[in-house]
Structures are given as C-alpha cells and as structure tokens.
Amino acid sequence: MFSMTVAAMRRHRIAGAAALAAALIAPGAAAAAAAAPAAQASVSRSALASGYGGSRAGNAALNWAEGHARGCWYSYGGSSCSPGYDCSGLVMAAFGHGAGIWLPHSTYSMLGNRHLHRISLSQARRGDLMFYGSGHVEINTIWYHQTFGAHHSGQRVGLRKWSPWWHPTAAYRVW
C-alpha cells in the first residue's frame, strides 16, 4: 500500500520546480492558476492515505486511458490508437472521451486552459496532469512517482516511473 507520507513527498520534491514550471506557463495562465480557490487542493485524510482525491474528470480520464490507450504505440502528433498517441494527444483524448473536457493538442496550450488549476507536486493525486520541463505531459496514477502516458517513439502507451533525471516539474488538476 501507499507508505510515503505527505511530509516525505514534500522533502523529495525537486528544488526549483516552481521556477521551472513557471517558465512553461503561457502568458495569462499564471494569473488564472493563482486565482483558483485554495480549497481546490484540499483532500480528506483518507484520500491522502489512499492516493485518491483528484478530480472526477481526472479519474474518468485515467480510467479511459487505461482501458482504451494502454499498449497503443507512440506517434508524434497522434491522438488515436491508430497511428498512435503523442503525450498531449493522449491527454486530449483521455479527458475528451473519458470526462467530456476537450483540452488542446499541445502541452504548452494546455497550460493556459481554463480547466487546469495549478497544485503543488505533493498535492498531486490520481488523474492530475504532471508536466515535465521538456514540454511533456502525463497523467498521474495512485502510485507515488508513477505516471501513465505516451512517452516517446518506439514505446507503447503505459506506466512510467520517475527517476532522478525524469520527473515532473509542475502538477495541475483538471476541473
């Protein structure tokens, strides 16, 4: 089960993650993220312990992605299993088909979308979007340090663990 405490998660956050993520945010998105109510990130103790507590939209999107896109090939610019998904195409399809929220097919455009609300990495839950400094996006799972996404050419859509050189720099919840 989930044995990492919230305090331990905070200690493992990357130094400077906020600065890196701020560099990714399109003009106007920072103000929208800052204006989001603080209550959006609050979750119950049982939700923290279980790893759940993300939005309904995020849970629905991850369920759709795991059921419909797992095992499909990566294809740059793709947004369906044939020919394949790229990272933002998978997120767009998962939230569109799974939750009825159609996000743009571009990682950078997603950051400025009104449905995304910035949260700290330690507050990330199942279904939240995890952005990487390289312009990559994946969907968070309930497992600490693991995301679901379309990674790169030659790989299939699926789970990926974080590593010292590959980890998110920003997290967003979709409402």
Where are the predicted features?
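Catalytic cysteine-centered active-site loop
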Residues: G51-S55, G67-R126
